[in-house]
Design a protein with these regions (language model features):
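Acidic metal-coordinating catalytic centers involved in nucleic-acid phosphodiester chemistry
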Residues: 1-18, 71-155
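Catalytic centers of nucleases
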Residues: 16-17, 23-91
C-alpha cells in the first residue's frame, strides 16, 4: 500500500481542482436559476468566475449583484474565518452598491455566523447543502426548463 506524505497532500492539486469544478457548477446553477425566475430581468447579467469572490453575478452595467463563496470539503462545517473574510470583502464594495447579496455554497450544512448578512445558498427545495453529483442533476433538470433567449448570431 502506498502512502502519501503530508507535504504531498498539502501540495496536491486534487482538492483545488475539485474545488474549481464545484465552483463552476455552483455558478452555472445560480445563473440558470436566475434565468428561470426572470429571464427578461437578468438579460445582460454576467457570471464572473474568480473575480471579486469564487464567483459573482454582475448586472448589465457591471455592478455587483451578488457574491458567492463555494466550499466542497467533506466533513468540514465550520467556516467562520472564510465568512468573516467574505463580509470584509463585501463591505469594501458596498459603497458602490449597498444592496450586494452574499451567498455561501457548500456540500455540507454550515454553521453560519450571525450578523454577517451572508446566507447559505438555497439549492433546491430549501436545502442549503448540495454535493457535486446532485448539482449536476439539478442543472440538467433546469436546462430543460430555461427559456431560450435571443442572442446575436455569432459567425
Amino acid at each position: 500500500m502506498t502512502t502519501v506524505s503530508s507535504r504531498e497532500q498539502i501540495n496536491s492539486a486534487i482538492g483545488t481542482w475539485s474545488g474549481f469544478i464545484y465552483q463552476g457548477l455552483c455558478g452555472i446553477l445560480t445563473a440558470l436559476k436566475m434565468i428561470e425566475a426572470d429571464s427578461a430581468g437578468v438579460a445582460g447579467y454576467k457570471l464572473q468566475l474568480d473575480g471579486y469572490e469564487d464567483f459573482s453575478i454582475l448586472d448589465g452595467t457591471d455592478q455587483i449583484v451578488s457574491l458567492h463563496q463555494c466550499k466542497c470539503i467533506k466533513g468540514r462545517t465550520e467556516y467562520a474565518e472564510d465568512l468573516n473574510k467574505m463580509k470584509i470583502k463585501r463591505d469594501s464594495l458596498t459603497n458602490k452598491r449597498p444592496d450586494i447579496k452574499s451567498y455561501f455554497h457548500c456540500n455540507e450544512t454550515v454553521a453560519m455566523v450571525e450578523g454577517l448578512e451572508i446566507e447559505p445558498y438555497p439549492f433546491k427545495n430549501g436545502k442549503t447543502k448540495c454535493g457535486p453529483g446532485e448539482l449536476k442533476s439539478i442543472i440538467k433538470g433546469l436546462t430543460c426548463k430555461v427559456p431560450c433567449l435571443s442572442y446575436p448570431k455569432i459567425l
